[in-house]
């Protein structure tokens, strides 16, 4: 199993969620990338349930994504709903 996201998948996510052509760091893109990393790490932990170091990293990523989504919900509610639906995560 590889570490993190492969560059093609990352580029694909950036293309889908970017606001303009040069956008790579907007909240929308960051949430999408974090969600992909969280999904990848969740699959890893199903295979390796005693990998506590990775589990802690997962919890930190989930917390970071939660904070970003909270900010997005407050500042851009329509974009928040759209991202929640696209990524299939609870809001």
Curated annotation (Swiss-Prot):
Top-level division of the source organism's lineage: Bacteria
Gene Ontology cellular-component terms listed: cytosolic small ribosomal subunit
One Gene Ontology term from the biological process aspect of the record: translation
PROSITE patterns (alphabetical): RIBOSOMAL_S15
CDD domains reported for this sequence: Ribosomal_S15p_S13e (cd00353)
Keywords for the protein's UniProt record, in alphabetical order: Ribonucleoprotein, Ribosomal protein, RNA-binding, rRNA-binding
Alphabetical list of Gene3D superfamilies matching this protein: 6.10.250.3130, S15/NS1, RNA-binding
A GO molecular function held by the record: rRNA binding
S-S pairs: none
PANTHER family: RIBOSOMAL PROTEIN S15, BACTERIAL AND ORGANELLAR, SMALL RIBOSOMAL SUBUNIT PROTEIN US15M
Protein role: One of the primary rRNA binding proteins, it binds directly to 16S rRNA where it helps nucleate assembly of the platform of the 30S subunit by binding and bridging several RNA helices of the 16S rRNA.
Family: Belongs to the universal ribosomal protein uS15 family.
Oligomer and partners: Part of the 30S ribosomal subunit. Forms a bridge to the 50S subunit in the 70S ribosome, contacting the 23S rRNA.
Record protein name field: Small ribosomal subunit protein uS15
Species of origin: Petrotoga mobilis (strain DSM 10674 / SJ95)
